[in-house]
Amino acid sequence: MKSGRFIGVMSGTSLDGVDVVLAAIDERMVAQQASYTHPIPLQLKKDILGMCQGQSTTLSAVGKLDAQLGILFAEAVLALLAKEGLSAQDITAIGCHGQTVWHEPLGEPAFTMQLGDNNRIAAMTQIATVGDFRRRDMAYGGQGAPLVPAFHHALLAHATEKRMVLNIGGIANLSVLLPDSPIRGFDTGPGNMLMDAWIWRNCSLPYDKDACWALSGHVNQPLLEQMFNDPYFRLPAPKSTGREYFNAAWLDKQLARIPGVTAEDIQATLAELTAVSITEQVRLAGGCDRLLVCGGGARNPLVMARISALLSGTEVCTTDDAGIRGDDMEALAFAWLAFRTLSGKPGNLPSVTGASRETILGAVHPVSSW
């Protein structure tokens, strides 16, 4: 496939909405044309969180959530098409990541589960849909994540400048794009996830807007050291994680060991944990001249300020400064991965995921004969 118009659909660990992006894509260029964020109903969000955090469930509940998410993702695509005055015939394919409810890359056997029925998306939109991107990489011994570094390299790598791309979603992940070196990428640990969980529990707010609550507190050093002592932070790459590990139950275990910390100081310490765990991994990966940040955490002034302070000598900016809207980065990546799949080209990077080989990713759900 030489070119086409693709739609990428992404619902990440932050659960702050379904991101939908339209882009014209060919071998040399990804040109974003439109974007839209579709709301996630509150009850559906609660159902997702319950499943992600290991609460007991049933096959019926899993199947129902899979169908509900397929419908939600299809509605998000249809809303974007209506907003832009487009029809199904204008679109080559959809690339849908799905909603991760469990990710266990070190299991025996390793597995990952993304819900959102791609058959339903294809049927409701009448657009060929590519999904289930992660499990083929796992079948070849990889972690199935992260997959976005290949896209970061295609768009943002530089011939001489040492660059890294940092996505701060619910989980933070880093793409290491150093000249004349293999591409690397991995999850550094919690991004917004723990901060969001804590402010939701205490203030019934979905996130700490402008870090106002965190800025009212102070970092508690014993608590920070207790949390940063978690074995995940010392694991070598390749490594990946998610809400099934860094969640409210994990936080409660840490707090039980350091009692008496005020709620606002806990929020400030969680922001510091995100910044420290990221910058430590940047240093261990060799450092960079320029750190390009995307995701919701790029709008957290405290986290961004701390990253800049901890990485003196590195220019810390957003991907918006490089011409790519940070909020759309991951959805755009899965539109690009759908293009790679339909072009018969590999989408994973063994140097990132640990897979034994490059491979074409995803399953294709057509709406007509090929």
From Swiss-Prot:
GO terms for biological process: 1,6-anhydro-N-acetyl-beta-muramic acid catabolic process; amino sugar metabolic process; peptidoglycan turnover. Pathway: Amino-sugar metabolism; 1,6-anhydro-N-acetylmuramate degradation; Cell wall biogenesis; peptidoglycan recycling. ATP binds at residues 12-19. Keywords: ATP-binding, Carbohydrate metabolism, Kinase, Nucleotide-binding, Transferase. Its EC number is 2.7.1.170. It catalyses: 1,6-anhydro-N-acetyl-beta-muramate + ATP + H2O = N-acetyl-D-muramate 6-phosphate + ADP + H(+). InterPro entries: Anhydro_N_Ac-Mur_kinase, ATPase_NBD. CDD domains: ASKHA_NBD_ANMK. It is an enzyme of class 2 (transferase). GO terms for molecular function: ATP binding; kinase activity; phosphotransferase activity, alcohol group as acceptor. HAMAP family: AnhMurNAc_kinase (MF_01270). Belongs to the anhydro-N-acetylmuramic acid kinase family. Catalyzes the specific phosphorylation of 1,6-anhydro-N-acetylmuramic acid (anhMurNAc) with the simultaneous cleavage of the 1,6-anhydro ring, generating MurNAc-6-P. Is required for the utilization of anhMurNAc either imported from the medium or derived from its own cell wall murein, and thus plays a role in cell wall recycling. This is Anhydro-N-acetylmuramic acid kinase.
